Amino acid sequence: MTIKLELLESALRNALGDQLQSLTLALGEITIVVNSRDYASAMRVLRDHADLRFEELIDLCGVDYSTYGDGAWDGQRFAVVSHLLSITHNWRVRVRVFASDDEMPVVASMTEIWPAANWYEREAFDFFGILFEGHNDLRRILTDYGFIGHPFRKDFPVSGYVEMRYDPEQKRVIYQPVTIDPRENVPRVIREEQYGMK
């Protein structure tokens, strides 16, 4: 671990205290996990604390952990992952917060702390169904208003639920149930030891 990362780790532990659930270092990056009830206050500390000063929200996205890793995931299903940048100190941190309810995932909105979170949170809502409490305009951003479900959830069917087509009799685009038969895709398994090595 570099001196810079050691300083960042120490500053994070001191500033966040009990709000910090875990801190891991991998591939030269620090990832912290905070509880959903502490999310807003922890993010405000990350932005305002003099030893941290994470002024920029670089990215925010939703994650569905239902089939993460080699088997079934045993923790909460949905998380929001944010990437923050401190211009003052020239360091970065990844913040992960898990929604406490898998059926109705809700976390606090970051739009009051970083206005740039607006469209990121709308995208996470649109694709994963994660609700952001306090967001003043939480609506779909990339799928159409009649879209059913959230397409980045791992239990969403690959073919979707409805398809659009132009109806010449009605002279407009209409929705109809998907006409594709669902099937299970089996990954190709290559058993030859030296396959593709020649």
Curated annotation (Swiss-Prot):
| Major localisation | membrane
Give an example GO molecular function: quinone binding
Report which residue ranges the record marks as coiled coil: none
Q: What membrane topology term does the record carry?
A: Peripheral membrane protein
Where in or outside the cell it occurs: the entry states: Cell inner membrane
EC class name: translocase
Q: What is its EC number?
A: 7.1.1.-
Gene3D superfamilies on file: NADH:ubiquinone oxidoreductase, 30kDa subunit (3.30.460.80)
Q: Name one GO cellular component term.
A: plasma membrane
Q: Which cysteines are joined by disulfide bonds?
A: none
Keywords per UniProt: Cell inner membrane, Cell membrane, Membrane, NAD, Quinone, Translocase, Transport, Ubiquinone
Q: What reaction(s) does this enzyme catalyze?
A: a quinone + NADH + 5 H(+)(in) = a quinol + NAD(+) + 4 H(+)(out)
On the tree of life, the source organism's domain of life is: Bacteria
The keyword Lipid metabolism appears for this protein: no
- NCBIfam families for this protein: NuoC_fam, PRK06074.1-1
Q: How does it assemble?
A: NDH-1 is composed of 14 different subunits. Subunits NuoB, C, D, E, F, and G constitute the peripheral sector of the complex.
Family, per entry:
Belongs to the complex I 30 kDa subunit family.
Role, per record: NDH-1 shuttles electrons from NADH, via FMN and iron-sulfur (Fe-S) centers, to quinones in the respiratory chain. The immediate electron acceptor for the enzyme in this species is believed to be ubiquinone. Couples the redox reaction to proton translocation (for every two electrons transferred, four hydrogen ions are translocated across the cytoplasmic membrane), and thus conserves the redox energy in a proton gradient.
UniProt protein name: NADH-quinone oxidoreductase subunit C
The source organism is: Herminiimonas arsenicoxydans
